[in-house]
């Protein structure tokens, strides 16, 4: 179900946070976010449970935790300001929800870049039935 929802949002071209996050990932990693990170491990994609399977999956776990701290915000749909400067992502909003959400996405995109060598195809389309261990705390 999580796959269908995110793909549907992606195909509609929503000009919201999920689109922006995907753009950050594409820029930093050079991979298409949906095809590379959707349903990867226990945390990349919609929802998450269990223990992260590798450093790439941990990037998604930390991203989920960051979104969880976005109290009163709508992290999946809010549109924020950002740009790329000298290979870096720079968030434009100075305060509040939009800044927090942008920073969550920026940190995750950089995490994916730093951990590209841990990406393992065996965790792509990973079954949630393999994610039954107790979750780490945020």
Curated annotation (Swiss-Prot):
<keyword id="KW-1015">Disulfide bond</keyword>
<dbReference type="Pfam" id="PF00068">
    <property type="entry name" value="Phospholip_A2_1"/>
</dbReference>
<keyword id="KW-1203">Blood coagulation cascade inhibiting toxin</keyword>
<dbReference type="InterPro" id="IPR036444">
    <property type="entry name" value="PLipase_A2_dom_sf"/>
</dbReference>
<keyword id="KW-0479">Metal-binding</keyword>
<feature type="binding site">
    <location>
        <position position="47"/>
    </location>
    <ligand>
        <name>Ca(2+)</name>
    </ligand>
</feature>
<dbReference type="GO" id="GO:0005543">
    <property type="term" value="F:phospholipid binding"/>
</dbReference>
<feature type="disulfide bond">
    <location>
        <begin position="73"/>
        <end position="97"/>
    </location>
</feature>
<keyword id="KW-0443">Lipid metabolism</keyword>
<dbReference type="InterPro" id="IPR033112">
    <property type="entry name" value="PLipase_A2_Asp_AS"/>
</dbReference>
<feature type="signal peptide">
    <location>
        <begin position="1"/>
        <end position="16"/>
    </location>
</feature>
<dbReference type="GO" id="GO:0005509">
    <property type="term" value="F:calcium ion binding"/>
</dbReference>
<dbReference type="InterPro" id="IPR033113">
    <property type="entry name" value="PLipase_A2_His_AS"/>
</dbReference>
<dbReference type="GO" id="GO:0047498">
    <property type="term" value="F:calcium-dependent phospholipase A2 activity"/>
</dbReference>
<protein>
    <recommendedName>
        <fullName>Basic phospholipase A2 Pla2Vb</fullName>
        <ecNumber>3.1.1.4</ecNumber>
    </recommendedName>
</protein>
<comment type="function">
    <text>Snake venom phospholipase A2 (PLA2) that exhibits medium anticoagulant effects by binding to factor Xa (F10) and inhibiting the prothrombinase activity (IC(50) is 90 nM). PLA2 catalyzes the calcium-dependent hydrolysis of the 2-acyl groups in 3-sn-phosphoglycerides.</text>
</comment>
<feature type="disulfide bond">
    <location>
        <begin position="66"/>
        <end position="104"/>
    </location>
</feature>
<keyword id="KW-0106">Calcium</keyword>
<feature type="disulfide bond">
    <location>
        <begin position="42"/>
        <end position="131"/>
    </location>
</feature>
<feature type="binding site">
    <location>
        <position position="64"/>
    </location>
    <ligand>
        <name>Ca(2+)</name>
    </ligand>
</feature>
<comment type="similarity">
    <text>Belongs to the phospholipase A2 family. Group II subfamily. D49 sub-subfamily.</text>
</comment>
<dbReference type="GO" id="GO:0090729">
    <property type="term" value="F:toxin activity"/>
</dbReference>
<feature type="active site">
    <location>
        <position position="63"/>
    </location>
</feature>
<feature type="disulfide bond">
    <location>
        <begin position="65"/>
        <end position="138"/>
    </location>
</feature>
<keyword id="KW-0800">Toxin</keyword>
<keyword id="KW-0964">Secreted</keyword>
<keyword id="KW-0378">Hydrolase</keyword>
<feature type="binding site">
    <location>
        <position position="45"/>
    </location>
    <ligand>
        <name>Ca(2+)</name>
    </ligand>
</feature>
<feature type="disulfide bond">
    <location>
        <begin position="91"/>
        <end position="102"/>
    </location>
</feature>
<keyword id="KW-0442">Lipid degradation</keyword>
<keyword id="KW-0732">Signal</keyword>
<keyword id="KW-1199">Hemostasis impairing toxin</keyword>
<dbReference type="InterPro" id="IPR016090">
    <property type="entry name" value="PLipase_A2_dom"/>
</dbReference>
<dbReference type="GO" id="GO:0006644">
    <property type="term" value="P:phospholipid metabolic process"/>
</dbReference>
<dbReference type="GO" id="GO:0050482">
    <property type="term" value="P:arachidonate secretion"/>
</dbReference>
<feature type="active site">
    <location>
        <position position="105"/>
    </location>
</feature>
<dbReference type="GO" id="GO:0005576">
    <property type="term" value="C:extracellular region"/>
</dbReference>
<feature type="binding site">
    <location>
        <position position="43"/>
    </location>
    <ligand>
        <name>Ca(2+)</name>
    </ligand>
</feature>
<dbReference type="GO" id="GO:0016042">
    <property type="term" value="P:lipid catabolic process"/>
</dbReference>
<feature type="disulfide bond">
    <location>
        <begin position="44"/>
        <end position="60"/>
    </location>
</feature>
<feature type="disulfide bond">
    <location>
        <begin position="59"/>
        <end position="111"/>
    </location>
</feature>
<dbReference type="InterPro" id="IPR001211">
    <property type="entry name" value="PLipase_A2"/>
</dbReference>
């Amino acid at each position: 179900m999580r796959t269908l929802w995110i793909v549907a949002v992606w195909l509609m071209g929503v000009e919201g946070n999920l689109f922006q996050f995907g753009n950050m990932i594409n820029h930093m990693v050079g991979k298409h976010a949906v095809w590379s990170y959707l349903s990867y491990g226990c945390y990349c994609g919609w929802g998450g449970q269990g223990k992260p399977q590798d450093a790439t999956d941990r990037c998604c776990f930390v991203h989920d935790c960051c979104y969880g701290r976005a109290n009163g915000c709508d992290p999946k749909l809010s549109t924020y300001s950002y740009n790329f400067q000298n290979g870096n992502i720079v968030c434009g909003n100075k305060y509040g929800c939009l800044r927090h959400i942008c920073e969550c996405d920026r940190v995750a995109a950089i995490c994916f870049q730093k951990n590209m060598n841990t990406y393992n195809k065996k965790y792509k389309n990973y079954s949630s039935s393999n994610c039954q261990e107790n979750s780490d705390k945020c």
